[in-house]
Amino acid sequence: MSILDYFRSSKKPNTASLAKERLQIIVAHQRGERGAPDYFPKMKQEIIEVIRKYVQISDDQVSVQLDQNDDNLSVLELNVTLPDSK
């Protein structure tokens, strides 16, 4: 067995496992939005608009998530992938 065969034999995910992983991500995202307050979608959009005043970004570069703990504590998590500055 050559060294090239070792690297070629790495397992590629089959379509079923890839589809399962994607479905799990979608379900987790929908569950997170289910407990969100009514104002959350509008607030999310307004936050994105404010960021766009300063940086050119697309919707897929922004992730906004609201996590609610059992202790009546809500955490708003905002992840923005900023473009490289030149």
From Swiss-Prot:
Keywords assigned by UniProt, alphabetized: Cell cycle, Cell division
Family: Belongs to the MinE family.
Pfam families in alphabetical order: MinE (PF03776)
Top-level taxon in the UniProt lineage: Bacteria
SUPFAM superfamilies: Cell division protein MinE topological specificity domain (SSF55229)
Function comment: Prevents the cell division inhibition by proteins MinC and MinD at internal division sites while permitting inhibition at polar sites. This ensures cell division at the proper site by restricting the formation of a division septum at the midpoint of the long axis of the cell.
GO biological process terms held by the UniProt record: cell division; regulation of division septum assembly
Species annotation: Shewanella frigidimarina (strain NCIMB 400)
Protein name: Cell division topological specificity factor
